[in-house]
Amino acid sequence: HRDLHVRSRRQRQMCIRDSLGAVDSQMSKVKKELDDHDVVFQPGLNEDLAATALWGSQQAELRGEGLFDGVFGLWYGKGPGVDRSGDVMKHANMAGSSTYGGVVMAMGDDHTGESSTVLHQSDFAMIDASIPILSPAGVQEIIDYGLYGWALSRFSGLWVGLKVMKDTVEATSVVDGNIDRVSFSSPPYVKPEGGLNIRLVDQPVDQEERLVDYKIEAARSFAKENNIDKCVWKGGQNPKIGFVAAGKNWLDLVHSLSLLGIDEKDSERLGITTYKVGQIWPLDTLSFESWADTLDLIVVVEEKRKILEGQIKEYLFDNSKGRRVYGGKKQGVELFSSKFALDPVEIAEKIGYILEEEGCGSDKLLSNLYYVVNSRKAENTSEIASRIPYFCSGCPHNSSTKIPEGSRAYAGIGCHYMAQWMDRDTLGYTHMGGEGANWIGEAPFSSTGHVFQNIGDGTYNHSGIQAIRAAVSSDVNVTYKILFNDAVAMTGGQGNDGGLDASRVVAELNAIGVKKVVVVYDEKEDVNFDLFNPSVETYERSELQNVQKKIRNEKGVSAIVYIQTCAAEKRRRRKRGKFPDPDKRVFINTDVCEGCGDCGVQSNCVSIIPVQTELGRKRAIDQSSCNKDFSCVKGFCPSFVTVEGAKIKSKAFGEILLPELPDPVLPKIHGTYNIIITGVGGTGVVTIGAVLAMAAHIDNKGAGMMEMAGLAQKGGAVHIHCRLADNPEDISAIRVATGEADAIIGGDLVVTSGSKTISLMKESRTQAIVNSHEIVTGEFTRDTDFFIPNDRLKLSLEARLKDAVSFFDATDLAKLTLGDSIYSNMIIFGSAWQKGMIPLSYKSIKKAIELNGASTELNLKAFEVGRWAILFPIEAEKVYKSRVTELPKNLQERIKFRETHLKEYQSDRLAKRYIDFVSRFSGTFLEDAVAEGYHKVLAYKDEYEVARLHTNTISKLREEFDGELKITYHLAPPVLSKLGNDGRPIKKEYGYFM
């Protein structure tokens, strides 16, 4: 929701934003340059207010007060923002754009619902407001069509929609940024008296007349004059079959024809012509008729609800030539579905059969069609394991979304939406800004007397306060839990518009009549309570459950403002030195740990990981991902210690003594070379894609890269599609199709072995290198027995690729050589390059890593470690297994280990007692269970045993950390500890003297 004003005849540009990813953060980085060029980048707060501000920008010169001849503006927002802006869109479009201004609305559509609560198609909202729609195919056309859109807006007096989708707007591509590469001319169109642009004094009836009688036709005329729609393949002298598509579907169509082996020369022979539409509404029907004149069959390739097909059929309805039009249906049977989205393989299958029916079924086409049909079967591969998004390590929502037993809660828009799959009695949500208003309608008819409603500070600021006011007016019993995490976390961690802070939220809630407002805060953060009214009740976050139990009994609307900074934003700020970084780390002594999982229950933290020991599965802290929230320490377990002065230990890079590494034979590119990068959100996967694309640019190759993540930045699955070509024009759709992957850089075994990735692989074509480390999923926080079936996942990849897949533990290798698992993806990348899987030069990759600018030296080292690891796998294995405990290989070794353990625990006599008892069951099916169970009975961990086991804590710490270590034990001795309000013993801190 921001708005944009640039200069032409002393024009100014204004940009008002909605949350279209990182546009605003990028704009903020170049604020000086924008200011120098009269570009105003301005918060819009929410989408409809942003659009209203742009409406105002078109009026700047109407009263003779304008500082510039005109202002041209850009609004950008996702589909939900388009929907909520419908009223202002109609008003502003009826009023019109200014003569030297113009407005473009970039609408981010999510056809597949990967990062939205509904599957969005905004086209019909635009059409309903009579706003023309441009549909760019690729990054270059976003620039070109944006410029065209402003020119069209000025000429026609209409606002103009620019449809952007994941395949275009979330893609990386090499483009020509010179705006002089495109130019536009005005058609000889006769306008009414007074023109088509905005007027100071105007009447609704007159506005409608201009819109219906002139403006829409002016848009068609402008499209024809500037050839926005183009015939790409002419199809010879007398083409009979024509394919029509626009935007993302145009890229899909080009790709699908390639899959069928049809090139432009074949199209001439077969009489196939293609038509690329740029302005999808209103369609330039005169240009279309000229193209379609000789055709017998027109196939409209279009996903979702049909826009082009309807216009084409309406135009051809009275046509006597009898041309057939296939689109959503073919002779009454579904062809291109209105559900979900289309992909090149699906399109290739459908049009392949059509061409065969139309007599174009050459041996080559039929052979390729057979392959396409069979490759689609791979998409039905069953999932062995999956990785869903989850709260980050140390995320405030880990604590804030917990509710007392007997209560229930609603989710909403934001990261807390994920609480719905975390067993937190949280189900149901609304659109942004409606949080809690659903309860107004449900409450009178429900036996439930009270609910909690989660809402983030970004949503509150955007529109959520209106829902709270509505709840106050209705006097329903609801407690709003407002997380103030100081960041709009879902869209990149931006700050709240208008400088909103927690004290203002509390003051506003009191002012609108919320009956009780309390503040719960993270005691580790420096909250300035001088800004709050002294009467406000404040509690540390450990009291949250008790606060909720009390407040749910309040009548009417109440609120808890929960203050804790977003974990991802904390991490970013700490790297920049702008947030306190406690000199403290959490460590679990695995000898003391019993693997009960209560630490995961208390913290819901994905930095708690499993570790196999001789005595079973225990817990450990992943120091690389830990965000120092320390909630895990509350687990009812004496194994936790915190340590100050600790620096993560890693072997110095030189200790590996890398030999001089030979250069690999790089693969040749035939058409395109397709690379898939997989991994876990937040672990640097996107960085690898960015480096690849930049290296290709440095090597003078074409490159297209697209991130397919959705909520994956929150710990879910990430897929990066990267296509390389010797010539940029050889790249159509960036999304790699089924069976088309040449190389897989597998940063995570779960994601790489998933059906979405495996379907892209083809034996004899695809090579893969995969990180074999068990990167746990969020499921482990709730299920103590959860494990990732690594062996089965590896087998599934080997079944598909045979010997063309390699595995090694890049995570542990990164930790032990570079001190942080974040470099594991770069290590896998280095291995893939050394194995001859990446058609880019070493020099270009090195330069791309340097240009990326993030931890340059360590990333370069990681790349070299990866090269070394694939050439010297035995030596690499010795490194990454150096801290792995050698487990007993059979039952007799397990019994022997437990015998030794009992001697250390107490005495030889106790050990003999154990052996004597177990021997009674030797050779029976009970022997294994008795050997483990009886040992647990004898080696009971009382206070004395815990103390004995903690005597080796310092040596265990020395294995993982360097520095002058100051240890604190976190214990709840039965005699000394008190019970908290939640009935759990309160842990106390004890120094090393213990």
Model-derived regions, located:
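Iron-sulfur cluster-binding cysteine motifs and their immediate structural context
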Residues: Q564-T565, E569-R576, E594-K651
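Conserved thiamine diphosphate
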Residues: D109-W159, M165, V190-R199, Q203-P204, ...
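Conformationally flexible catalytic loops at phosphate/diphosphate-handling active centers
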Residues: S156-G235
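Single conserved hydrophobic/aromatic residue that forms the stacking wall/gate
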Residues: H1-R12, I16
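Active-site cofactor/cluster-binding pocket
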Residues: V82-R84, L500-S503, E508, K516, ...
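Thiamine diphosphate
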Residues: L20-R154, M165, T401-K402, R408-M490, ...
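Small-residue-enriched alpha-helical segments and adjacent helix-cap loops
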Residues: E893-M994
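Peripheral docking tails and interdomain loops at the edges
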Residues: Q140, E302-I388, Y521-K549, S558-Y562, ...
